[in-house]
Amino acid sequence: MHKIYFDRRSIIICTPEEAALTDPNAVEFHFTDKSDIRPLVEMFETSTTLERIYIPSDAVEECYRIVCCQFKEVNAAGGLACNRRGDFLMIRRDGLWDLPKGHQEAGEDISVTALREVEEETGVEDLQLGDLICVTDHCYRRNNIWHLKHTWWYHMSYLKPVDLIPQTEEDITKAAWVAKSSLPPYLKNTYPSIREVFLAAKIV
């Protein structure tokens, strides 16, 4: 299954046997290699009540690649950093809680992108890189072009005390270590893709 987010809503590419049949809000779109994704994007833009569109397919990976190719694809990476107390590093940007992340630079390994972006956005250095958690997909429009951002998320650990320094030029107003027991209100005020990272990491 692949989930492509449009802010808080999503297009879900899955097998016919998956969740579409049990979701009471399911809207199905039957996709072929000649299908155009733009009608789905336009549906999201014009209908604020539409939450999820399912694309059932017996060839999920092939269908996913066909969909991806209809956007301008960009790569990004970030991290779910944990300190020795078991707190998680989060940032506040545009009024919502988020995880530090950013775009991949030319020729840069994606894991290096993840470490660099977390350090730049929070001031935390000497992070230890762990395993890949998941990859999330998010669509956005820029200069009248639809982009599809693939974000690689990694486990990270930090063992030193540090004063957090939010990167204000990236509209980050706060960086904070959040205890696991305190996560629920933070995850309520974040993006669905960020909740997906915590779920994939088996934190919540």
Predicted regions and their residues:
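Conserved Nudix-box catalytic region and its N-terminal flanking loop in Nudix hydrolases
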Residues: A20-F31, C82-E119, V124
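N-terminal leader/capping segments at the start of a protein or of a new domain
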Residues: M1-T46
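Conserved beta-strand and immediately adjacent loop positions that scaffold enzyme active sites
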Residues: G78, D87, K174
